[in-house]
Regions:
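A bilobed periplasmic-binding-protein/Venus flytrap-type ligand-binding module shared by bacterial periplasmic
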Residues: 59-71, 169-192
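Short beta-strand->loop
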Residues: 42-57, 112-115, 149-176
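Hydrophobic residues within well-ordered alpha-helices
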Residues: 17-19, 79, 129-131
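Second-shell loop/turn segments in exported
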Residues: 83-91, 116-117, 134-135, 184-186, ...
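Bilobed "Venus flytrap"/periplasmic-binding protein-like clamshell domains
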Residues: 1, 54-128, 143
């Protein structure tokens, strides 16, 4: 038997927090996982598999919601220059997955929106910012739209999902799908503990929460997402070289 101590780490400055706390195991989004693969030798033990998900490697997505009366907003490209509302800057499906959709359409996600209002999981929340007109559009994470409807926090017909994917999945989405939550070991974890945790997780029954832990793939897509956003393993792409500066300002330099 092993004694387990649980420590909650803030997503902001995750790498520094991990180095400070020195955990052997982490549970996080796929985005944080691929970041720590390259930085600290993270190794997947298992990934969450939920009943409602298409598959463990295609389970997490985002929706863009607008007020139903905003007839000027019909497509994701109509959102350029508008005000966005989201949960946290580093929230995987509450922010990054949605911004990846912007990048996939050839836009710079850093400048696409004129302003972003973050709710930080407090009130006013994302739908409220959109409802009162403080934001033009909001990003919601996996199945959050359906949960808000079920609990009565938003009403049917009050909001509209932009470019909803036409599929038979349990939850609507506007974006690509990515792997679910990952349980992984860091390079410092003792081998016998990694073995014990692996056996425990992979043999754990679904239970009342209707999910289980399984081995999963699909992380190449997460690398592509993080590269398009210049985050995580690709944060170095944000370093501007002289050549980059000249190319991005060549019009001004010629005047």
């Amino acid at each position: 038997d092993y004694k387990i101590s649980v420590v909650e780490l803030q997503q902001n400055n995750l790498l520094a927090n991990v180095v400070k706390e020195r955990p052997d195991f982490l549970v996080s989004s796929a985005g944080n996982f691929v970041t720590l693969i390259s930085k600290l030798g993270a190794q997947q033990i298992a990934t969450v598999s939920r009943n409602h998900a298409y598959s463990p490697k295609e389970a997490v997505s985002s929706v863009f919601i607008v007020r139903n009366d905003r007839k000027d907003l019909q497509k994701i490209t109509d959102l350029k220059g508008r005000v966005l509302s989201a949960t946290e800057p580093h929230d995987f499906d509450g922010m990054l997955v949605g911004m990846g959709e912007i990048a996939a359409r050839g836009f710079d996600p850093d400048t696409f929106f004129s302003k972003t209002l973050f709710s930080h999981y407090q009130y006013p929340d994302v739908p409220t910012y959109v409802k009162v007109g403080a934001a033009d559009v909001g990003i919601l994470g996996t199945c959050q739209y359906e949960k808000l409807l079920t609990t009565g926090q938003i009403q049917p017909g009050e909001f509209r999902v932009l470019e909803a994917k036409n599929n038979t999945e349990a939850c609507i989405r506007s974006t690509e799908r990515y792997p679910d939550t990952v349980f992984y070991a860091l390079d410092t974890a003792p081998i016998d503990e990694v073995k014990a945790v692996s056996l425990s997780l992979l043999s754990m029954p679904k239970g009342e929460f209707d999910f289980e832990w399984v081995p999963a793939s699909g992380f190449l897509k997460v690398y592509d997402l993080m590269k398009s956003l210049k985050l995580g393993p690709y944060e170095h792409l944000r370093e501007t070289t002289v050549k980059d500066f000249i190319l991005s300002h060549q019009k001004e330099l010629l005047l």
